[in-house]
Amino acid sequence: MNPTAPQGGQLWSRCGGCASLLYRKRLRRNLDVCPECGAHSRLDASARLAQLVDPGSFTALPDRAPEVDPIGFVDVLPYPHRLTAARSGTGLVEAVVCGTATVAGHRCAIAVMDFRFLGGSLGCAVGELITRAAERALADRVPLVVVTASGGARMQEGVLSLMQMATVSQAIAALRESGVPSISVLTDPTYGGVAASFATNTDVVLAESGARMGFAGPRVIRQVTGRELPDGFQTAEFLLRHGQVDLVVPRHALRGRLAMLLAAAAGGRPPVGGGSRSEYSPGDRPSAAACRGEGQDAWETVRLARHPGRPTTLDYLETGFDGFVELHGDRLGADCPAVVGGLADLAGRPVMVVGHQKGHTTAELMARNFGMASPAGHRKALRLVRLAARWGLPVVTLVDTPGADPGVDAEEQGQAAAIAENILTLTTLPTPVVAVITGEGGSGGALALAVADRVLMLEHAVYSVISPEGCAAILWPDRSAAPQAARALRLTSADLCRLGVVDAVVPEPAPAAHHDPPAAVQAVREAVLAHLVPLLDVPTATLVRCRRRRFRRFGASRLGVRAGAR
């Protein structure tokens, strides 16, 4: 599918995708991507490094892995003879090149695999070299970047090659434990033991356009199952749809995307130590000045909160934040379109943003399931907030959902458990969290993104245990009583501010956000900054303790509200 880029003095090259005859210099100028069909040719490690890192910045690691022939393997040739031939043909010592470099000025340790060397297979020496690169990243506290190209474990080294999956994985685990970022770049092909270890257990997984990745190769799958495989099976685009990778990036954009990720990783705050801060007290109820929206009719507010012209999460990200890089997938087989999230810049600070996404048109709403997250959506959000905690990034959540997906599939896939795990994780997340209810805050689907240090709410948003229609159908029972139910539920921003559920109400441009979306976006940006910045210097232990205290106050013994009180 993706033949190796031609070497030496060849003047012409035939594309492996469309069979076009291409002038070699033109192909090289286009980064070995066919200008006719976009097929990406395979690159050797040297060419890959030249495209990704800053000129002159790469320094190879001084260590050289020992020669190994652990089991004396012989097929038609002794294994050492195959190693000699591979070294002669590639000029490499092994199937990976490791060192340190900068990408757009950001330091990293980097390991680049080369498929030309015995199919990029993972043997003891390759595992040792990548592990040393990870250990260098840990020692220097710089991100690790791994560019994969491999057919899998090296058969000639027997089960010891299998052990390299664990060896490198535990080196990645050490990076996670220490909060040192790791990023993998999947190139064609990435299979077997490499795919099932360090290629996919990094913090962020990028895939070059057209790259194929899987545990078993397509030929094996056909033989075992006796079935034909779907078009595009195991390609980067297939993997994205099935939640396996964060991004699919064409080669010309790969360096830029990598630079943005490294910049975000470098901008994370280190854990703040020390004792408690007496001036930080999220247990206090909001002041009357913070509670706007007095006198608004609850049912009319519901209608405004649902207006399709209100800004969506992607609208807020487009103009209220800078440099958004969306990260996809739950890593378990799906990418829910009702939840979007990723890395963004807020006034020079990298943040993780996660939110529900609805849309403005009927087609958009249907494609996004009206902002109703599936279990995959909640698990994607969970993965991203955990990543934020590891990288030391604050979290901003934007809540706009009528509720979690109530379908049969969602129940079969563990909707309740997915929501529960989000709530549990957010209660102890060791990084600042600011949540904004921007439209509808529907029940547990909303709370799954709204357990936060500060909860803000737009003036004409709503937040409720159930929709007014649902409440009316159950308790009246008459769906036409929805307006009456809305008033009884106390779901407006002013009501919830008085109850202490939200900390502040964000004013909307008159008469509501959909009349002036840019102004609404700016108001949210300013409010998030005002509430987030003071949290950045709070010691982690204090932050978590105060967040727990914030939600503990909603117990019956602490509310101080008499039965039947209005």
From Swiss-Prot:
GO terms for biological process: fatty acid biosynthetic process; malonyl-CoA biosynthetic process. It catalyses: N(6)-carboxybiotinyl-L-lysyl-[protein] + acetyl-CoA = N(6)-biotinyl-L-lysyl-[protein] + malonyl-CoA. InterPro entries: AcCoA_carboxyl_beta (IPR034733), Acetyl_CoA_COase_a_su (IPR001095), Acetyl_CoA_COase_Trfase_b_su (IPR000438), ClpP/crotonase-like_dom_sf (IPR029045), COA_CT_C (IPR011763), COA_CT_N (IPR011762), Znf-ACC (IPR041010). Binds 1 zinc ion per subunit. Pathway: Lipid metabolism; malonyl-CoA biosynthesis; malonyl-CoA from acetyl-CoA: step 1/1. The keyword Coiled coil does not apply. Residues 1-243 are annotated as: Acetyl-coenzyme A carboxylase carboxyl transferase subunit beta. One of its GO terms (molecular function) is zinc ion binding. The keyword Lipid biosynthesis applies. Residues 282-534 form the CoA carboxyltransferase C-terminal domain. Residues 11-534 are annotated as: Carboxyltransferase. In the N-terminal section; belongs to the AccD/PCCB family. In the C-terminal section; belongs to the AccA family. Component of the acetyl coenzyme A carboxylase (ACC) complex. Biotin carboxylase (BC) catalyzes the carboxylation of biotin on its carrier protein (BCCP) and then the CO(2) group is transferred by the transcarboxylase to acetyl-CoA to form malonyl-CoA. Acetyl-CoA carboxylase is a heterotetramer composed of biotin carboxyl carrier protein (AccB), biotin carboxylase (AccC) and two subunits of ACCase subunit beta/alpha. This is Acetyl-coenzyme A carboxylase carboxyl transferase subunits beta/alpha. The lineage of its organism: Bacteria, Bacillati, Actinomycetota, Actinomycetes, Micromonosporales. The gene is accD.
